[in-house]
Amino acid sequence: EDGAALFKSKPCAACHTIDSKMVGPALKEVAAKNAGVKDADKTLAGHIKNGTQGNWGPIPMPPNQVTDAEALTLAQWVLSLK
């Protein structure tokens, strides 16, 4: 499954859109912030799977029920957005 399909099939869109900030940051902003960062795909995959807090303000991102492979696919797709 590709990243766009996973984005639609998982609860990502409850808080994120590609272009605009909602509860969470716009995915294009995430891509821009992480452009050129070493191992950004692995770091982002960990945030997707395990949740994170404090990177984009006070609202935490909850853990998501995804496999390691799905998290990495989603992360690589997010980072590809321009």
Curated annotation (Swiss-Prot):
Effect of E1D: In strain: 181, 217, 191 and 204
Record annotation: effect of changing G46S: In strain: 181, 217 and 191
Chain sites annotated for binding heme c: C12, C15, H16, M61
Keywords: Electron transport, Heme, Iron, Metal-binding, Transport
GO MF: electron transfer activity; heme binding; iron ion binding
UniProt PTM: Binds 1 heme c group covalently per subunit.
Outcome (variant: P63A): In strain: 181 and 217
Function: This is a prokaryotic monoheme cytochrome, unreactive with mitochondrial cytochrome C oxidase or reductase. It functions in nitrite and nitrate respiration in Pseudomonas, but it is also found in other bacteria.
Organism: Pseudomonas fluorescens biotype C
One Pfam entry name: Cytochrom_C
Residues in coiled coil: none
Family annotation (SUPFAM superfamilies): Cytochrome c (SSF46626)
Name by which UniProt lists this protein: Cytochrome c-551
Documented effect of changing Q65P: In strain: 181, 217 and 204
Listed InterPro entries: Cyt_c-like_dom, Cyt_c-like_dom_sf, Cyt_c_ID
